Amino acid sequence: MNRINQLFSTKQKDILSIYFCAGFPTLEGTASTIKVLEKKGINMIEIGIPFSDPMADGPVIQHAATRALKNGMTLKLLFDQLKDIRKEVQIPLVLMGYLNPIMQYGFKDFCRTCRETGIDGVIIPDLPFKDYMEEYRSVAEEQDVRIIMLITPETSEERIRLIDEHTDGFIYMVSSAAITGAQKDFNAQKQAYFQRIADMNLRNPRMIGFGISNKQTFETASAHAAGAIIGSKFVTLLDEENGNAEKAADKLLEALKN
């Protein structure tokens, strides 16, 4: 069974997934950051593939991607860094990146290398659902790689039902149509959106991302979904701690408690 499906079959609430950008703040820190996060009890990890034009990302992750590219991070290097990761790490690993670098690598080769490396799923924010259905789905399924689709408050119920029917893993609920970034709490409008999707009784579990940074936002997200994805907050802490993932993780977990 794919590790993503395994996670959601054994844990339905308070799942914590952490995002960081490969190659930031240092080129060589990717594998060690993953190992630290698993040791700290994180349930799932999203590893960002840096790209020069990350349209869905706020200033924190854009800055991380720019620096990672300057450091020399590439998709090929990332796979090289992760080639032995499954000797030590058991939790689900998801790659998050834009279509351009993935297509340059070759989608079939990309999915095959994901399987060989032990990557369980991929989030591609700029992959249209129609293209996923027509061109990409069968290739990914062949390699047991889950393609995770995003929905926003603007996504129609019809589209959400289609995504739920034709994907497997989890649905990434973007908390707002805006770019990524931390916020103190979710307003009533966003909470109504979370509840509206919860009431649809979808087949796939849901994870809420964009804007999770503290106890309040994590608890709100977890009340309406299986858990939350934290990106900008952890990337900021990683930068402040000069790549010391242990200190950054401790500070993040502290923020989620108090």
Protein language model regions, located:
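Hydrophobic faces of well-ordered beta-strands that scaffold small-molecule active sites
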Residues: 16-20, 45-47, 93-97, 122-124, ...
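Glycine-rich phosphate-binding active-site loops on the catalytic face of alpha/beta enzymes
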Residues: 43-53, 119-130, 171-182, 224-244
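Catalytic beta/alpha-barrel core
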Residues: 70-73, 118-132, 146-155, 174
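N-terminal amphipathic alpha-helix/helix-capping segment at the start of soluble metabolic enzymes
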Residues: 1-20, 83-87
